[in-house]
Protein backbone atom coordinates (compact mmCIF):
# COMPACT_ATOMS: atom_id res chain seq x y z
CA UNK A 1 0.00 0.00 0.00
CA UNK A 2 1.32 3.44 -0.90
CA UNK A 3 1.82 5.87 1.97
CA UNK A 4 0.79 9.53 1.99
CA UNK A 5 0.71 11.64 5.13
CA UNK A 6 0.02 15.16 3.82
CA UNK A 7 -2.48 16.36 1.24
CA UNK A 8 -4.45 19.43 0.20
CA UNK A 9 -8.23 19.17 -0.19
CA UNK A 10 -10.81 21.56 -1.62
CA UNK A 11 -14.32 21.39 -0.17
CA UNK A 12 -17.60 23.19 -0.76
CA UNK A 13 -20.85 22.83 1.14
CA UNK A 14 -24.11 22.92 -0.76
CA UNK A 15 -26.18 26.08 -1.08
CA UNK A 16 -29.72 26.24 0.25
CA UNK A 17 -32.62 25.96 -2.17
CA UNK A 18 -34.71 29.06 -2.88
CA UNK A 19 -38.11 29.59 -1.30
CA UNK A 20 -41.21 29.33 -3.48
CA UNK A 21 -43.78 32.03 -4.30
CA UNK A 22 -47.06 30.19 -4.75
CA UNK A 23 -50.75 30.68 -4.00
CA UNK A 24 -53.40 28.10 -3.30
CA UNK A 25 -55.56 27.58 -6.35
CA UNK A 26 -58.65 25.42 -5.88
CA UNK A 27 -62.16 25.42 -7.21
CA UNK A 28 -64.59 27.50 -5.16
CA UNK A 29 -61.73 29.03 -3.14
CA UNK A 30 -61.32 32.59 -4.35
CA UNK A 31 -58.60 33.74 -1.98
CA UNK A 32 -56.55 30.67 -1.18
CA UNK A 33 -53.63 32.59 0.24
CA UNK A 34 -49.90 31.85 -0.01
CA UNK A 35 -48.68 28.26 0.12
CA UNK A 36 -45.05 28.49 -1.09
CA UNK A 37 -42.73 26.04 0.68
CA UNK A 38 -39.20 26.59 1.95
CA UNK A 39 -36.09 25.53 0.07
CA UNK A 40 -34.09 22.52 1.26
CA UNK A 41 -30.85 22.93 3.20
CA UNK A 42 -27.54 22.42 1.43
CA UNK A 43 -25.37 19.43 2.24
CA UNK A 44 -22.54 19.87 4.75
CA UNK A 45 -18.98 18.53 4.58
CA UNK A 46 -17.65 16.49 7.52
CA UNK A 47 -14.46 14.63 8.37
CA UNK A 48 -14.57 11.41 10.37
CA UNK A 49 -11.83 9.16 11.75
CA UNK A 50 -12.41 5.51 10.83
CA UNK A 51 -10.73 2.18 11.49
CA UNK A 52 -8.73 0.32 8.88
CA UNK A 53 -6.92 3.29 7.31
CA UNK A 54 -3.28 4.25 7.84
CA UNK A 55 -2.63 6.49 4.85
CA UNK A 56 -4.17 9.47 3.04
CA UNK A 57 -3.43 7.99 -0.38
CA UNK A 58 -7.10 8.10 -1.46
CA UNK A 59 -6.94 11.90 -1.41
CA UNK A 60 -4.17 11.88 -4.01
CA UNK A 61 -6.69 10.78 -6.62
CA UNK A 62 -9.59 12.98 -5.50
CA UNK A 63 -8.98 16.39 -3.97
CA UNK A 64 -12.32 18.11 -4.63
CA UNK A 65 -15.40 17.37 -2.55
CA UNK A 66 -18.56 19.36 -3.28
CA UNK A 67 -21.79 18.68 -1.40
CA UNK A 68 -25.08 19.00 -3.28
CA UNK A 69 -27.33 22.02 -2.93
CA UNK A 70 -30.86 21.90 -1.55
CA UNK A 71 -33.82 21.77 -3.92
CA UNK A 72 -36.13 24.82 -4.21
CA UNK A 73 -39.42 24.89 -2.36
CA UNK A 74 -42.70 24.10 -4.11
CA UNK A 75 -46.35 24.99 -3.89
CA UNK A 76 -48.77 23.33 -1.50
CA UNK A 77 -46.32 24.11 1.32
CA UNK A 78 -43.83 21.51 0.08
CA UNK A 79 -40.25 21.91 1.32
CA UNK A 80 -37.44 21.20 -1.12
CA UNK A 81 -35.22 18.17 -0.61
CA UNK A 82 -32.04 18.85 1.36
CA UNK A 83 -28.65 18.12 -0.18
CA UNK A 84 -26.76 15.07 1.06
CA UNK A 85 -23.81 15.54 3.39
CA UNK A 86 -20.31 14.46 2.36
CA UNK A 87 -18.09 12.67 4.90
CA UNK A 88 -14.32 12.55 4.36
CA UNK A 89 -13.13 9.29 5.92
CA UNK A 90 -9.62 9.74 7.31
CA UNK A 91 -7.25 7.59 9.40
CA UNK A 92 -7.17 7.95 13.16
CA UNK A 93 -4.45 10.48 14.00
CA UNK A 94 -5.29 12.91 11.19
CA UNK A 95 -4.90 16.62 11.85
CA UNK A 96 -7.10 19.01 9.88
CA UNK A 97 -5.29 22.25 9.20
CA UNK A 98 -6.51 25.53 7.72
CA UNK A 99 -5.24 26.88 4.42
CA UNK A 100 -2.52 28.89 6.20
CA UNK A 101 -0.88 25.51 7.07
CA UNK A 102 -0.57 26.57 10.71
CA UNK A 103 -4.02 26.74 12.33
CA UNK A 104 -5.12 23.29 13.52
CA UNK A 105 -8.89 22.99 13.09
CA UNK A 106 -9.19 19.54 14.64
CA UNK A 107 -7.12 16.53 15.68
CA UNK A 108 -9.02 13.29 15.15
CA UNK A 109 -7.46 10.81 17.57
CA UNK A 110 -10.36 8.41 18.21
CA UNK A 111 -12.42 6.15 15.98
CA UNK A 112 -15.77 7.76 15.20
CA UNK A 113 -14.62 11.28 16.06
CA UNK A 114 -16.24 13.71 13.62
CA UNK A 115 -15.81 17.41 12.82
CA UNK A 116 -17.93 19.77 10.70
CA UNK A 117 -15.74 21.41 8.07
CA UNK A 118 -18.30 23.38 6.04
CA UNK A 119 -21.93 23.96 7.02
CA UNK A 120 -24.50 23.71 4.24
CA UNK A 121 -26.52 26.82 3.47
CA UNK A 122 -30.01 27.20 4.91
CA UNK A 123 -32.95 26.95 2.54
CA UNK A 124 -34.80 30.15 1.70
CA UNK A 125 -38.26 30.88 3.09
CA UNK A 126 -41.31 30.49 0.90
CA UNK A 127 -43.92 33.24 0.70
CA UNK A 128 -46.09 31.44 3.27
CA UNK A 129 -43.57 32.57 5.92
CA UNK A 130 -44.20 36.23 5.09
CA UNK A 131 -47.96 36.16 5.58
CA UNK A 132 -49.07 38.61 8.26
CA UNK A 133 -52.15 40.46 9.42
CA UNK A 134 -51.28 43.36 7.15
CA UNK A 135 -49.98 41.38 4.18
CA UNK A 136 -52.30 38.49 3.41
CA UNK A 137 -50.81 37.70 0.00
CA UNK A 138 -47.02 38.22 0.09
CA UNK A 139 -45.39 37.87 -3.29
CA UNK A 140 -41.82 37.40 -2.16
CA UNK A 141 -39.55 34.58 -1.01
CA UNK A 142 -35.95 34.29 0.14
CA UNK A 143 -33.12 32.78 -1.89
CA UNK A 144 -31.16 30.05 -0.14
CA UNK A 145 -27.88 30.79 1.61
CA UNK A 146 -24.80 30.05 -0.51
CA UNK A 147 -22.45 27.21 0.38
CA UNK A 148 -18.97 27.66 1.85
CA UNK A 149 -15.79 27.17 -0.19
CA UNK A 150 -12.78 26.11 1.82
CA UNK A 151 -9.28 24.76 1.33
CA UNK A 152 -7.85 22.52 4.04
CA UNK A 153 -4.79 20.36 4.64
CA UNK A 154 -4.93 16.83 6.03
CA UNK A 155 -1.83 15.74 7.93
CA UNK A 156 -1.51 12.23 9.32
CA UNK A 157 0.45 11.58 12.50
CA UNK A 158 0.47 7.88 13.26
CA UNK A 159 -0.63 6.92 16.75
CA UNK A 160 1.94 4.72 18.47
CA UNK A 161 3.11 4.20 22.04
CA UNK A 162 6.84 4.08 21.25
CA UNK A 163 8.93 5.42 18.38
CA UNK A 164 12.19 4.11 16.93
CA UNK A 165 14.95 6.60 16.14
CA UNK A 166 18.40 6.21 14.67
CA UNK A 167 20.68 6.73 11.71
CA UNK A 168 20.06 4.73 8.53
CA UNK A 169 21.14 1.10 9.00
CA UNK A 170 21.01 1.31 12.79
CA UNK A 171 18.85 -1.81 12.79
CA UNK A 172 15.45 -0.25 13.48
CA UNK A 173 13.53 -2.38 10.98
CA UNK A 174 15.27 -5.53 12.21
CA UNK A 175 14.31 -4.63 15.78
CA UNK A 176 10.69 -4.06 14.75
CA UNK A 177 10.58 -7.34 12.85
CA UNK A 178 12.14 -9.28 15.75
CA UNK A 179 9.79 -7.90 18.40
CA UNK A 180 6.47 -7.53 16.58
CA UNK A 181 4.24 -8.89 13.86
CA UNK A 182 5.45 -6.25 11.40
CA UNK A 183 7.46 -7.30 8.35
CA UNK A 184 9.25 -4.18 7.10
CA UNK A 185 11.76 -4.36 4.28
CA UNK A 186 15.24 -5.15 5.61
CA UNK A 187 18.46 -4.77 3.59
CA UNK A 188 22.10 -3.85 4.07
CA UNK A 189 21.97 -0.35 2.61
CA UNK A 190 20.87 3.07 3.91
CA UNK A 191 17.26 4.26 3.66
CA UNK A 192 15.77 0.80 3.21
CA UNK A 193 12.78 2.16 5.13
CA UNK A 194 11.09 4.86 3.06
CA UNK A 195 7.78 5.12 4.93
CA UNK A 196 6.77 4.65 8.58
CA UNK A 197 5.92 1.13 9.76
CA UNK A 198 3.85 0.07 12.76
CA UNK A 199 4.17 -3.11 14.80
CA UNK A 200 2.28 -4.49 17.80
CA UNK A 201 4.63 -5.71 20.54
CA UNK A 202 3.73 -8.10 23.34
CA UNK A 203 5.64 -8.19 26.63
CA UNK A 204 4.55 -9.96 29.83
CA UNK A 205 0.97 -10.16 28.61
CA UNK A 206 0.80 -6.47 27.69
CA UNK A 207 0.66 -4.98 24.21
CA UNK A 208 1.78 -1.67 22.76
CA UNK A 209 2.48 -0.20 19.32
CA UNK A 210 5.92 0.75 18.01
CA UNK A 211 6.49 3.08 15.05
CA UNK A 212 9.59 2.76 12.88
CA UNK A 213 10.40 5.81 10.76
CA UNK A 214 13.03 6.32 8.05
CA UNK A 215 16.51 7.02 9.38
CA UNK A 216 17.76 10.52 10.05
CA UNK A 217 21.12 11.90 8.96
CA UNK A 218 23.00 15.03 9.91
CA UNK A 219 21.24 17.98 8.30
CA UNK A 220 17.88 16.22 8.04
CA UNK A 221 16.22 19.33 9.48
CA UNK A 222 17.59 21.19 6.43
CA UNK A 223 16.18 18.63 4.02
CA UNK A 224 19.11 16.24 3.63
CA UNK A 225 18.39 12.57 3.14
CA UNK A 226 14.65 12.06 3.49
CA UNK A 227 14.36 15.15 5.68
CA UNK A 228 12.82 15.18 9.15
CA UNK A 229 9.12 15.30 8.20
CA UNK A 230 8.65 11.71 9.35
CA UNK A 231 9.39 12.80 12.92
CA UNK A 232 5.76 13.94 13.05
CA UNK A 233 4.80 10.27 13.31
CA UNK A 234 6.56 9.86 16.66
CA UNK A 235 5.28 13.12 18.19
CA UNK A 236 2.39 11.27 19.86
CA UNK A 237 4.62 8.54 21.32
CA UNK A 238 5.04 8.22 25.08
CA UNK A 239 8.69 7.15 24.78
CA UNK A 240 11.42 7.07 22.12
CA UNK A 241 13.85 4.19 21.60
CA UNK A 242 17.13 5.47 20.17
CA UNK A 243 19.07 2.68 18.48
CA UNK A 244 22.77 3.25 17.90
CA UNK A 245 24.86 1.01 15.64
CA UNK A 246 27.47 -0.51 17.96
CA UNK A 247 29.74 -1.46 15.05
CA UNK A 248 30.22 2.19 14.11
CA UNK A 249 33.60 3.72 14.96
CA UNK A 250 31.89 7.08 15.61
CA UNK A 251 29.24 5.85 18.01
CA UNK A 252 29.15 8.98 20.19
CA UNK A 253 28.97 11.27 17.15
CA UNK A 254 26.15 9.13 15.75
CA UNK A 255 24.21 9.50 19.00
CA UNK A 256 24.68 13.27 19.10
CA UNK A 257 23.62 13.62 15.46
CA UNK A 258 20.16 12.24 16.24
CA UNK A 259 19.81 14.35 19.38
CA UNK A 260 20.75 17.44 17.38
CA UNK A 261 18.09 16.68 14.78
CA UNK A 262 15.45 16.22 17.49
CA UNK A 263 16.32 19.62 18.94
CA UNK A 264 16.29 21.23 15.49
CA UNK A 265 12.85 19.76 14.77
CA UNK A 266 11.40 21.61 17.76
CA UNK A 267 8.26 20.97 19.74
CA UNK A 268 8.28 18.58 22.67
CA UNK A 269 10.11 15.80 20.84
CA UNK A 270 13.56 16.44 22.32
CA UNK A 271 12.11 16.43 25.83
CA UNK A 272 10.27 13.10 25.55
CA UNK A 273 11.42 10.14 27.67
CA UNK A 274 14.15 8.37 25.74
CA UNK A 275 15.76 4.94 26.03
CA UNK A 276 19.11 4.32 24.35
CA UNK A 277 20.21 0.91 23.09
CA UNK A 278 23.44 -0.12 21.37
CA UNK A 279 22.52 -2.55 18.60
CA UNK A 280 24.41 -5.21 16.60
CA UNK A 281 26.45 -6.58 19.51
CA UNK A 282 26.42 -9.97 17.73
CA UNK A 283 29.05 -8.49 15.38
CA UNK A 284 31.27 -7.17 18.21
CA UNK A 285 33.74 -8.74 20.62
CA UNK A 286 33.24 -8.37 24.41
CA UNK A 287 35.87 -5.65 24.76
CA UNK A 288 34.34 -3.53 22.01
CA UNK A 289 30.94 -3.90 23.63
CA UNK A 290 32.27 -2.79 27.02
CA UNK A 291 34.31 0.16 25.71
CA UNK A 292 31.65 1.54 23.39
CA UNK A 293 28.88 1.08 25.91
CA UNK A 294 30.91 3.01 28.47
CA UNK A 295 31.55 5.83 25.97
CA UNK A 296 27.88 5.97 25.05
CA UNK A 297 26.76 6.04 28.69
CA UNK A 298 29.11 8.94 29.30
CA UNK A 299 27.55 10.83 26.36
CA UNK A 300 23.96 10.05 27.34
CA UNK A 301 24.36 10.44 31.08
CA UNK A 302 22.20 7.36 31.64
CA UNK A 303 21.89 3.63 31.12
CA UNK A 304 22.57 2.14 27.70
CA UNK A 305 21.10 -1.26 26.80
CA UNK A 306 23.07 -3.67 24.64
CA UNK A 307 21.02 -5.67 22.14
CA UNK A 308 21.11 -7.63 18.93
CA UNK A 309 18.05 -7.55 16.73
CA UNK A 310 19.42 -10.40 14.62
CA UNK A 311 20.28 -12.74 17.51
CA UNK A 312 17.46 -11.56 19.78
CA UNK A 313 19.85 -10.69 22.61
CA UNK A 314 18.61 -8.20 25.22
CA UNK A 315 15.33 -7.43 23.46
CA UNK A 316 12.99 -8.32 26.34
CA UNK A 317 14.87 -6.05 28.73
CA UNK A 318 14.43 -3.12 26.36
CA UNK A 319 10.75 -3.92 25.78
CA UNK A 320 10.12 -3.99 29.54
CA UNK A 321 11.81 -0.60 29.91
CA UNK A 322 9.63 0.78 27.12
CA UNK A 323 6.49 -0.65 28.70
CA UNK A 324 7.36 0.92 32.07
CA UNK A 325 7.41 4.38 30.44
CA UNK A 326 4.25 3.70 28.41
CA UNK A 327 2.33 2.35 31.40
CA UNK A 328 3.25 5.43 33.44
CA UNK A 329 2.13 7.75 30.63
CA UNK A 330 -1.18 5.91 30.27
CA UNK A 331 -1.79 6.22 34.00
CA UNK A 332 -1.19 9.97 33.86
CA UNK A 333 -3.61 10.27 30.92
CA UNK A 334 -6.33 8.42 32.84
CA UNK A 335 -5.91 10.73 35.83
CA UNK A 336 -6.27 13.79 33.59
CA UNK A 337 -9.63 12.53 32.26
CA UNK A 338 -11.19 11.51 35.58
CA UNK A 339 -14.38 13.62 35.98
CA UNK A 340 -14.56 15.78 39.09
CA UNK A 341 -16.92 14.60 41.79
CA UNK A 342 -17.87 16.55 44.95
Curated annotation (Swiss-Prot):
It is found in: Cytoplasm. Pfam families: GTP1_OBG (PF01018), MMR_HSR1 (PF01926). It comes from the Bacteria. It is an enzyme of class 3 (hydrolase). Its cofactor is Mg(2+). It comes from Cereibacter sphaeroides (strain ATCC 17025 / ATH 2.4.3) (Rhodobacter sphaeroides). Monomer. One of its GO terms (molecular function) is GTP binding. This is GTPase Obg. GTP binds at residues 166-173, 191-195, 212-215, 279-282, 308-310. The keyword Electron transport does not apply.
